[in-house]
Amino acid sequence: MVWTWMIALYLFLAGMGAGAFVLSGIAGMAKKPCPKIKMIGFIAGPVCVAVGTLLLVVDAHAGLMNPLRFFYLVSNLGSVMAWGVIILTLFIVVAAIDAIIMVVKKSTPRVLDIIGMVLAVCVAAYTGVLLGDASVAFPLWHPIILPVLFLVSAASTGFALVLVIAHGKAHDEIANIGFTVRSGMVLPVLEALLVIALLGTVAITGGSAAAAAKASVANLLTGGYALAFWVLFIIVGLAFPFVQALHKSMQEKKSLMQQPGLTIAGEVGVLIGGFMLRYLIVMAAIPVALG
């Protein structure tokens, strides 16, 4: 595996697509029907994951570049990559079938929705597991904290993607999924706590990985990636969306309908922060010195 910005983009697209599908699945089960929002996530979800998977295959120097090597990777069930491709493929297939049924019949079997949502959660967690599998070489990629962090971030970015599109295509249904206002306050806090836990845990790493661990944390907090970390991730990606969601929770619904620009800005901030989280985690990681 070659760790580049393309991997960061895959991690972002896969997580966002999975989160979008889950939100739309929940919207489809809401007391008040949200068929437009459900349609948005059921189409955007598998498309994002499919594009991300293509990037993963290409960046792994397989697929179009080396199909035989790719088939070897997939057939090796002892590798994290193989199980990841299986999970990704299953999700894309199930989600695509769900989307087609939704387009044709305007409704979908609840069992199929639930299967798709479970697979979506697995996809979101796998984006962290993929990096965590290399934690021996890259101590920043903690095998336990990172999957949870990416899962929470997937929910944030997936919800944000659906809401941004919904403001143009399903504005009348947004009020029916009011829980997204609460999630807009809770998820950034959870993300921040998990980032603190990740950096704190990595910073106290001992043994031969200690130097690489401390250098990785410093890279983010005070080093070459500090500006992007503090401005684009912390301020734009977490603090601004949290404040915007808090403000939204204190406004009346009528007032909210008149401020779509502020709401959309908050969701775009979430998307920027979601990509920057993955980009920074990938690019700022310092490998353990060999020998």
What are these regions (language model features)?
Residues M16-V94:
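Membrane helical hairpin/interfacial module
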Residues P46-L54, P188-L198, L277, I281:
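Selective recognition of specific alpha-helical transmembrane segments in multi-pass small-molecule
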Residues T4-W5, L11-L13, K31-P33, M39, ...:
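Long, contiguous internal "core" modules enriched in hydrophobic/ aromatic residues
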Residues M1-W5, L290-G291:
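Short, strongly hydrophobic alpha-helical membrane anchors
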Residues Q259-A265:
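Hydrophobic alpha-helical transmembrane segments
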Residues F275-G291:
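Juxtamembrane boundary at the C-terminal end of a transmembrane helix
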